[in-house]
Amino acid sequence: IHALQDQYSQKMPFTFLMPAAEAIYHPYDFRFVYEQKQIELDEAFFSARKEYKNDEYRNISQERIVDRDARFMDAGKMAAFVEENFSDCWNVVALRNAQYYQTQILEQQSEFGGMRLVFEEEKLVCIYAYAKEEGLEIREPLYLEGKEDLFWASVDGLREPEEKVSVYGLKEAPDWPDDETSAYKEKPLIMIRIVHLQEL
């Protein structure tokens, strides 16, 4: 309550959080506004993609794709990529400037991962976060339309043989040859509450 009073006195229009449990915050007028799409993929998914795409997939993996971990000096490029291609996708979003992506790089490195950049013919076509602290986790992949295969080829290059991959924040279920998307789910993640209505 004190935190909300402080935010009201600062004329903050709203506040948000990732709740430990909805029941704790619902009585204080917090409501979910974002559901994160999640899926867990195993060797069968990556093998099926290779089989399904065959020569096209091999061409992507060996010739077209160049991917690497982002460095601090890439943060501005990442912010510009997101602003130019994805800023219209969200109603409410954290300010994704160079400082945001520098912080993301450090956070992912603390979990034995990083921010991955995927290029096609020197053009940035995809960015995503990954962590390897407890198995491979892919977070919030953002790729240009038609570049999904480059993203998956990059992920395939990061994982160990037979390693399961958890993916968080996909825009849509992956193109799966056998149409097996039962592991694809949406989990409520972010709650929001209006604090100072006049500031909205």
Which positions does each model-derived feature cover?
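Conserved GNAT acetyl-CoA-binding A-motif
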Residues: 5-20, 160-172
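Amide-forming acyltransferase catalytic core, primarily the GNAT-like/NAT-type
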Residues: 31-148, 152-154
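Functionally constrained cores in energy, signaling, and assembly domains
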Residues: 5-8, 67-68, 116-122, 169, ...
